From Swiss-Prot:
Organism per entry: Chlamydia muridarum (strain MoPn / Nigg)
Matching CDD domains: RRF (cd00520)
Protein name as annotated: Ribosome-recycling factor
Protein family according to the UniProt entry: Belongs to the RRF family.
Entry GO MF terms: ribosomal large subunit binding
Keywords: Cytoplasm, Protein biosynthesis
Subcellular location: Cytoplasm
InterPro entries documented for this protein: Ribosome_recyc_fac, Ribosome_recyc_fac_dom, RRF_sf
PANTHER family referenced in this protein's UniProt entry, alphabetically: MITOCHONDRIAL RIBOSOME RECYCLING FACTOR PSEUDO 1, RIBOSOME RECYCLING FACTOR
UniProt-listed Pfam families: RRF
CC per GO annotation: cytoplasm
Lineage: Bacteria, Pseudomonadati, Chlamydiota, Chlamydiia, Chlamydiales
Length: 179
């Protein structure tokens, strides 16, 4: 495993972490809250983002416009079934969702989940580091000094990505606490 492939894998972990925490409800309307909701339409299960456009009509309200107006009730049912603590309101060919202000208990729970997810991401990054270091030690074509130098660079990458994860988690926690 080269330095660039290690960086690519670590970057993938960071991207996954960003996507995971984007879905945490902070009290502000954001399409990421519902875009992964699955909906039963046309005899199959599809993601909401594949069958409708999701927009923010104001800071606490989402507007979902299905590409096929016949899917409005299925979308409403899908949102309710997702247990997101969101109440869809069907208005003709659209669905509105008023995003409630999170309760203190909900905020504490989300912050706990956020910390768990950030720790899982950091563990994944450290596992990539361990795998790289193990492969370096097994590579007979490298000198001991070369191995030490590469291990140091891999550690620097690990520190960089762990710090980015911590920063994202702090930002999200501040966003949750400031509501």
């Amino acid at each position: 495993m080269t330095l660039t492939s290690a960086e690519k894998e670590m970057s993938g972990v960071l991207t996954f972490f960003q996507k995971e925490i984007r879905g945490f409800r902070t009290g502000k309307a954001h399409p990421a809250l519902v875009e992964t909701v699955t909906v039963e339409v046309y005899g199959t299960t599809m993601r909401l983002s594949d069958i409708a456009s999701i927009s923010v009509s104001d800071t606490r309200q989402l507007l979902i416009s299905p590409y096929d107006a016949g899917n409005v009730s299925a979308i409403s049912k899908g949102i309710l079934a997702a247990n997101l603590n969101l109440q869809p309101i069907v208005e003709g060919a659209t669905v509105r969702i008023n995003v409630p202000e999170p309760t203190e208990e909900y905020r504490r729970e989300v912050i706990k989940q956020l910390k768990r997810k950030s720790e899982e991401a950091k563990v994944s990054i450290r596992n990539i580091r361990r795998t790289c270091n193990d492969r370096l030690k097994k590579d007979d074509s490298l000198t001991e000094d070369a191995v030490k130098g590469l291990e140091k660079k891999i550690q620097e990458l690990t520190d960089k990505f762990c710090k980015q994860i911590e920063e994202l988690a702090k930002q999200k926690e501040a966003e949750l606490s400031s509501i």
